[in-house]
């Protein structure tokens, strides 16, 4: 189970330097969490405010003991288990110029490398482009967004690129982020050959009373323009409907040598993960420890199999061991982190914290 690997690995890692064997264990554990290797962000982008907001909402729900749906993003009302934000890696085609009366503020090619999305994942939402100039435009702008396509010319054996208009809107006041629905486009971009990016054009609003100040407005737009792409994906292999589990009563306090939950706080700084784990800084993982003596009482939360095993152990103690103290109820945690491509990711990981223990 994930928590067992986590506890054993972190417990050792916290007190010794990684030798080859521990390095291998770390790699295996990270792989089980969906990483190809240990992330090492060089110039990590800032965490988008929307991800901080969602993370804090989920932390509040966990404090209130609300069980989250690991395969549904309530904040966007779509199926999904992973939220990613991809920064724009494009370039300006026509940057701002010092024309006295500019007719176009800027033209920029937008490109989002979504190769971090695994082949098994299904894109359930592409929230579009977050256009965040962080500047209040006094008179508004005209905005156009195009998709870049590759068109094959019939009978000529070659192709050319063209643009398909996606959005054409006028914004009177732009003082907050803009989002456009690009779900279908993101789904097609999972084929890298089809990801030719987008083109963003911004024009000053055509009002003669404002054209004299358009230079300053356009210059500010380019200076403060920030674009990113937010996606929600669902991995069907990891989002199978869980089987109904037998419910057990909560364990009361028991003697120190009896099977029960023990406290274990994992601080990511202690194991050298603080560079890529953004939040939380640590969490209460807990673990199970203690004896499962014969006869098993109700407070030890034993299964039918464990009860029978203790009976057989009483007859053949040399051959049959006592049941083990293991988790019977676990809960997930949300983690905000940088992935192997320096993208900011918010993800639920199930079975990360022990809530109750019993003999099995």
Swiss-Prot record:
The keyword Disulfide bond applies. Pfam families: TGF_beta. This is Protein DVR-1. It is found in: Secreted. One of its GO terms (cellular component) is extracellular space. Keywords: Cleavage on pair of basic residues, Disulfide bond, Glycoprotein, Growth factor, Mitogen, Secreted, Signal. Belongs to the TGF-beta family. PANTHER family: PROTEIN DVR-1, TGF-BETA FAMILY. One of its GO terms (biological process) is positive regulation of cell division. Residues 17-246 form a propeptide. Homodimer. Gene3D superfamilies: Cystine-knot cytokines. The keyword Heme does not apply. Glycans are attached at residues 113, 181, 301. Disulfide bonds join 259-325, 288-357, 292-359. Vegetal region of the egg. Serves to facilitate the differentiation of either mesoderm or endoderm either as a cofactor in an instructive signal or by providing permissive environment. Residues 1-16 form the signal peptide. One of its GO terms (molecular function) is cytokine activity. Its main location: secreted. It comes from Xenopus laevis.
